[in-house]
Amino acid sequence: MNSAKHHEIARNIERSLAKCRPEDVEMRIEAAMLAGTHWLNAALHDIGANPPDKDVMHTYMLTINDFRRLSLPDPQPLAMLAEIEDIRPVYVRGDAPGGRQAADRACSLLDRLRAVALQAAAGR
C-alpha cells in the first residue's frame, strides 16, 4: 500500500477514534494500534526503509533482522507502535486496572507516530 493510502486510512480511523469517550478504553487502544500501524508504514515508505508492497502488520511479527533494519533510521517509531501493541492484550483482552490511563498513553503514542509520518511525508 502506498503512503497516501496509509495516510487516508489512518485519518479515517482517527475520525472514528475521536467519537470515542474516555471510558471507551478498548476501542481507543485498538484504534491507536490500527492507525499507528498505518502511520508507521507511511513513514517507512516515505523514508525509503520499506517499499510500498511491504507493510509492517505487527512489530512482534517482524524478524529480528527486519526489526533492526527498520529501526536504523530512527528506533522510536517502531518502539512506539510496539508499546501500543504491548498495552493491547492487558487492557483490550484483559481487565487490568488503569485502562483509561493506558488508553491515554496509547493515544499519546499515536499522536507521536502521526507527527513522525507527517514529517517523513514533508521530507520526501
Predicted regions: what they are:
Residues 1-124:
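Terminal alpha-helical segments
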